[in-house]
Amino acid sequence: PRRSTTTKLLDGLAQRGVKATFFLIGLNLDGNEDLVLRMDREGHQIGLHSYNHKLLTGLSTADFYTEVGALREKLTDLLGHNDFVLRPPYGKTDAGVRKLAGAPIILWSIDPEDWSDTDTARQTAHIVSQAQDGDIILLHDIYPSSVETALQVVDALLDEGFYFVTVDELFAAKGIILEDGQRYTCAKGG
């Protein structure tokens, strides 16, 4: 989380009654514990993204633990639960990541590449034109333009009759049981 942008996003989601899943980077937790507690308290799902946003493929077991296990422990200590999903940095996985994940691996079906394009109108149009039932949309909460895009997408898709839910709620609604080490990009079954 980033205090200014994440707070604005949480406020906007709360005003709209919308829940989301946040994949957190360990380095960004210090000093932002209250934001993470707020996410959890308001019904958002918390996921693991890694400690240092380091590529997880090819890591030794010890290095994987440094990136994922340490974040899992930190979040478990803070939140009092350990029911996390994992989104590897850059969406990159291999057999080692799948073996060591200890959680379902959640990727995405719509990626507007908001890290490289700050045009909110273009981002919003891209997402809204592609969105279908069961999609997982990747956006970041650290860029002001991404937060604006997220809230505009929520408004547009709510107007079209879409519902927004956490990753766990999405797959449960589709009758899909998430399994540790398995990769998921959307929930189109059921």
Task: Give the location of each predicted region.
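C-terminal domain-boundary segment and adjacent tail
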Residues: 15-16, 28-30, 145-190
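A polyampholytic, Gly/Pro-enriched intrinsically disordered region
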Residues: 127-135, 184-190
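Alpha-helical scaffold elements lining the catalytic groove of polysaccharide deacetylases
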Residues: 8, 54-81, 92-133, 146-152
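Short alpha-helix boundary/capping motifs
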Residues: 3, 29, 90-91, 147
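Active-site-proximal beta-strand/loop segments in catalytic clefts of secreted hydrolases
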Residues: 23-27, 50-51, 87-91, 108-111, ...
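Divalent metal-coordination and catalytic microenvironments
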Residues: 13, 46, 86-89, 105, ...
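Active-site beta->alpha N-cap acidic-glycine motif
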Residues: 1-77, 81-83, 156, 163, ...
